[in-house]
Structure formats: C-alpha cells, structure tokens
C-alpha cells in the first residue's frame, strides 16, 4: 500500500508542468464565468453590530472615528464604507473624527464615495468631518469633556459654531452611538476606556484581525458590540 502511494507521488512529479498551469488556470477562470453562488452568512459578531446600528432612531447622532492608514486600508476601509452606508441609509447624522493623521485621508475618501457620490448628502447638515487632532487618548478625553474646546473648526476650516448639525453637540454624551474603525493605538481600546465605559454611550468597532484578542474581553463585558 505504502509502495503504491510513493509511486503515485513520484508519477505526479513527472507530469508536464504545462498541464499543471492549465489546471490552475481553469480553477481560476471557471468560477468567474460560472459563479458558484455560495451564500454569504453574517457571523454573530457582525449581526450584533448591524442590529445595534439598525436599532438607532432616525436622526441619531453617531460619532465615527477613523484610526487607520493606507497599510491597513484593505482590511478596515470596507468596514468603514459599510458602516457609513448603513448609517446614511437609516438617516443618521454622522460626525467624523480621526485619531490618526492618515485617518483624515481615509475619512475624506470614504465620505466622498458614500456621502457625496452615493447618497448626495449635504455637508454640515447630514455629516461633518471634524478631522484629526494630535494627542492620542487625550483627544478622546477632550471629546468626552468638551468637544468644542478641542474642535473650534472642522477639517475644512469652518467654525464649528457655524455648522448647523453641531448645534447642541458639546461632549461625547450628546452622541447616541460611537463607532471606531481602528487598526491599533490609539483606537478602539482608548474609546472604550475613556469614552464608552465611563459615559455609557453604546459603541461598536471594526478592527484588524490582530486586535481581536485585545478587544474580545470588552465584547464579553458588553462594552462593545462587535
């Protein structure tokens, strides 16, 4: 029996490599022309996030923070796009902050695609990009205590007092929900520790796979819907 297996393995090694390339090519091309149509099932974690956002009342104020850059864009950006699309579909007001410098560029890209091109929304009335501020977790603490002291202008240089949707928004408790699109520090953990947990504002996050082990304890404590 073992001898037959060894002979089979050796015979495979003698196959003309061109046949191997043909098989690989067919394996790639056939599904493109004849899609298998396999169902896409949401995981329990994904469903929790969806339900948490879906349960928000229309015109709820949602703070979305961008904490990733080009290196993690392939992993995080689709989540950011998805959450923005879901929020705007449900007529929520979106306030965008950035704990990373690159996060502002990611946010501008996502808002241009979804808010402007897909939904045709009005800046300052339906969404606003407050932008990046240096300071890591100190920025989160500033938003918790006095957002207007930290953000006197938005990313476009417009005075916050002149932005219609900023009326009656002064601190993190004025928001109905927080979403962190995070690739690391500062990010999800800081939002939980300094904002969501102390104030009770519900929160969710989209993180890189490498952060899951760090974030899951907060999920188990129901501090994050992930």
Q: How should each PLM-predicted stretch be described?
A:
Residues 71-122:
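Membrane-embedded segments
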Residues 38-55:
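Alpha-helical transmembrane signal-anchor/signal-peptide segments
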Residues 224-226:
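Conserved small/polar residues in nucleotide/adenosyl-binding loops
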Residues 153-213:
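Charge-patterned, long linear interaction tracts outside catalytic cores
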Residues 3-12:
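Cytosolic juxtamembrane amphipathic/interface segments immediately preceding
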Residues 50-78:
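Short extracytoplasmic
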Residues 106-175, 182:
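A substrate-binding/cap region within the structured catalytic cores of diverse enzymes
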Residues 11-35:
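Hydrophobic alpha-helical transmembrane signal-anchor segments
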């Amino acid at each position: 029996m073992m001898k037959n297996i060894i002979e089979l393995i050796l015979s495979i090694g003698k196959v003309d490599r061109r046949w191997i390339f043909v098989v690989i090519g067919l394996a790639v091309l056939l599904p493109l022309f004849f899609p298998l149509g396999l169902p896409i099932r949401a995981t329990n974690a994904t469903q929790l996030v969806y339900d948490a956002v879906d349960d928000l009342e229309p015109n709820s104020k949602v703070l979305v923070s961008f904490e990733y850059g080009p290196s993690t864009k392939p992993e995080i950006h689709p989540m950011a796009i998805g959450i923005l699309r879901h929020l705007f579909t449900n007529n929520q007001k979106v306030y965008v902050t950035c704990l990373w410098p690159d996060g502002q560029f990611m946010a501008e890209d996502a808002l241009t695609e979804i808010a402007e091109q897909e939904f045709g929304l009005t800046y300052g009335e339906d969404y606003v990009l407050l932008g990046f501020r240096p300071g890591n977790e100190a920025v989160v603490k500033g938003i918790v205590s006095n957002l207007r002291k930290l953000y006197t202008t938005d990313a476009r240089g417009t005075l916050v007092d002149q932005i219609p949707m900023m009326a009656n928004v002064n601190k993190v408790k004025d928001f109905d929900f927080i979403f962190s699109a995070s690739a690391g520090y500062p990010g999800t953990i800081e939002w939980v520790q300094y904002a969501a947990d102390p104030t009770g504002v519900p929160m969710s996050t989209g993180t890189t796979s490498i952060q899951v082990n760090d974030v899951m304890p907060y999920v188990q404590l129901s501090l994050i819907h992930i």
